[in-house]
């Protein structure tokens, strides 16, 4: 490790211990070496004993910086992993991150706009940030060109070196995991960190986020379910993004939603519909749908509409992944575990030599207890989590797009059941999945595929005769080459047979001549002739092997 990495590691350990986060480790897992190591750091006591554990965890992650804050944001929706008091504190990381100086933000905006003063492009620029996140900060203004209210998102200054330094350290730690944990190699920690790095680096490029938001807005144009604010791409750069300012109720503010008369059941169901529409219709889904990025319009509470922001992380599935995923869900809820196992093999998610019977039994063992709950209480996200964890025991490769999907599905479920605890995800999603699968087979699907491919075939039609001629010529040449190789192999086989025969004869004559020369000297030159013949036969046989 470099001196800088050692200092950073020391800071991380000191931060964790000063907030007493060693309490998160179960006592049964604290081995003697760990206990001795903790005693050796006696000068790092818990300095926040008066605070609850959840608050201490939040403050520690906040102190460690953006890499750890994003990690905490991801964990905030995993209420199956933490008690409510910890999950509630982690959720605060989404909205309450200390802002950086507004003057620095203004300077960055001016640099992005070619060095011109902010007043040349915007009116009513507010130096006080509207919101502050782990990666970026948002300020409000009005466009000078048309007077529309906008928000300006700017990346935190000098954030990239900090992220890279932390990620480099995490990579080093990840390489130790297989040595420290018996199951560490199968977890592929380095690949997990690599995917996490890609996600973080992508979030630092606001041009990418702008393009994502424009695409998502186009996909849901005039939709009654989701509104995506307009992006003013002429003002956007890698470090700055300008988009329409929206007014809505945070989706986590259930009390205000109810006070506004929102149809909570319809709102929860529309969240599920929006997610499955993005995944299966558009193959392009918002993959960071935590409560801080979702609002609900004040207008028409009886027919509520979501407002989505922060499109820095998106995911996509190819056609085959979508089909296998939809069929997996339906097979699972029909308790057809054999079908689930076969789908994993057919899709290539697990190796083709996987024992399907063993895989089916493993899935049944893990998933059957889920059905002890009423169907309405079964979590899609946990279904995927259980399936993927089981499949990883059978050497399932890490599928980044499926990891993003599973994480997003947990977000959607968490929000939906917070809005309407009786939400039946399966009842809401099943018609959509069955309709989508039905749409992928039969005459309509064939007609659609022909329409999609028609321009390609029209373009390639003039080339077909030449391609056919080239193919026939190559086939003829290939056949000639195959025949030539076959003849050479046959000739080589014959030569090898002759060589072995002559070598055997030569060895026999040499041995016989030597024996007679020693035991029957009265035979005169006969043994010498035998030895000479054997040597000639052996030399001829040896040459045939060349």
Swiss-Prot record:
It comes from the Bacteria. SUPFAM superfamilies: Protein kinase-like (PK-like). Residues 124-502 form the Protein kinase domain. InterPro entries: ABC1_dom, Kinase-like_dom_sf, UbiB, UbiB_bact, UbiB_kinase. One of its GO terms (biological process) is regulation of ubiquinone biosynthetic process. ATP binds at residues 130-138, 153. GO terms for molecular function: ATP binding; protein kinase activity. It is a multi-pass membrane protein. The active site is at residue 288. Pathway: Cofactor biosynthesis; ubiquinone biosynthesis [regulation]. It is an enzyme of class 2 (transferase). Keywords: ATP-binding, Cell inner membrane, Cell membrane, Kinase, Membrane, Nucleotide-binding, Transferase, Transmembrane, Transmembrane helix, Ubiquinone biosynthesis. It holds the Pfam family ABC1. Its main location: membrane. The chain crosses the membrane at residues 501-521, 522-542. Its EC number is 2.7.-.-. GO terms for cellular component: plasma membrane. It is found in: Cell inner membrane. Is probably a protein kinase regulator of UbiI activity which is involved in aerobic coenzyme Q (ubiquinone) biosynthesis. Belongs to the ABC1 family. UbiB subfamily. This is Probable protein kinase UbiB.
């Amino acid at each position: 490790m470099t001196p800088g990495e050692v200092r950073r590691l020391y800071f991380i350990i000191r931060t964790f211990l000063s907030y007493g986060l060693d309490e998160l480790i179960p006592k049964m897992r604290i081995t003697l070496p760990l206990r001795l190591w903790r005693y050796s750091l006696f000068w790092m006591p818990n300095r926040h004993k008066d605070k609850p554990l959840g608050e201490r965890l939040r403050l520690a992650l906040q102190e460690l910086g953006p890499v750890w804050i994003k990690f905490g944001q991801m964990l905030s929706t995993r209420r199956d992993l933490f008690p409510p008091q910890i999950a509630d504190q982690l959720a605060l990381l989404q909205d309450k991150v200390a802002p950086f100086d507004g003057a620095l933000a203004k300077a960055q905006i001016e640099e992005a706009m070619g060095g011109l003063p902010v007043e040349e492009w915007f009116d009513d620029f507010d130096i006080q940030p509207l919101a502050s996140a782990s990666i970026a900060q948002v300020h409000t203004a009005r466009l000078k060109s048309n007077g529309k209210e906008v928000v300006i998102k700017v990346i935190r200054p000098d954030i990239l070196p900090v992220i890279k330094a932390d990620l480099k350290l995490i990579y080093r730690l990840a390489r130790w995991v297989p040595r420290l944990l018996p199951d560490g190699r199968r977890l592929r920690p380095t690949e997990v960190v690599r995917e996490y790095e890609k996600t973080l680096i992508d979030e630092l490029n606001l041009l990418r986020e702008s393009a994502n938001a424009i695409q998502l807005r186009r996909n849901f144009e005039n939709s009654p379910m989701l509104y995506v604010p307009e992006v003013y791409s002429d003002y956007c750069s890698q470090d700055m993004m300008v988009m329409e300012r929206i007014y809505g109720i945070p989706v986590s503010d259930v009390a205000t939603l109810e006070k506004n008369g929102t149809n909570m059941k319809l709102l929860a169901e529309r969240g599920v519909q929006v997610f499955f529409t993005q995944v299966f219709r558009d193959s392009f889904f918002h993959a960071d749908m935590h409560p801080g990025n979702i609002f609900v319009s004040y207008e028409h509470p009886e027919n509520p509409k979501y407002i989505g922001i922060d499109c820095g992380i998106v995911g996509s599935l190819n056609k085959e992944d979508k089909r296998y995923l939809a069929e997996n869900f339906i097979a699972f809820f029909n308790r057809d575990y054999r079908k689930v196992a076969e789908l994993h093999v057919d899709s290539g998610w697990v190796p083709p030599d996987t024992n399907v019977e063993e895989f089916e039994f493993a899935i049944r063992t893990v998933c059957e207890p889920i059905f002890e709950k009423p169907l309405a209480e079964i979590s899609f996200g946990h279904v995927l989590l259980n399936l993927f964890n089981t499949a990883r025991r059978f050497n399932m490769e890490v599928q980044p797009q499926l990891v993003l999907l599973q994480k997003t599905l947990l977000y959607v479920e968490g929000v939906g059941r917070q809005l309407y605890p009786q939400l039946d995800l399966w009842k809401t999603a099943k018609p959509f999945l069955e309709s989508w699968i039905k749409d992928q087979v039969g005459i309509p699907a064939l007609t659609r595929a022909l329409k999609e491919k028609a321009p390609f075939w029209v373009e390639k039609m003039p080339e077909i005769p030449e391609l056919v001629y080239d193919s026939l010529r190559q086939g003829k040449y290939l056949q000639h080459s195959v025949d030539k190789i076959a003849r050479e192999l046959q000739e080589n086989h014959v030569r090898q047979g002759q060589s072995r025969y002559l070598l055997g004869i030569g060895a026999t004559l040499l041995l016989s001549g030597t024996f007679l020369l020693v035991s029957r000297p009265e035979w005169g030159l006969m043994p010498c002739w035998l030895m000479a013949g054997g040597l000639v036969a052996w030399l001829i046989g040896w040459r045939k092997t060349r």
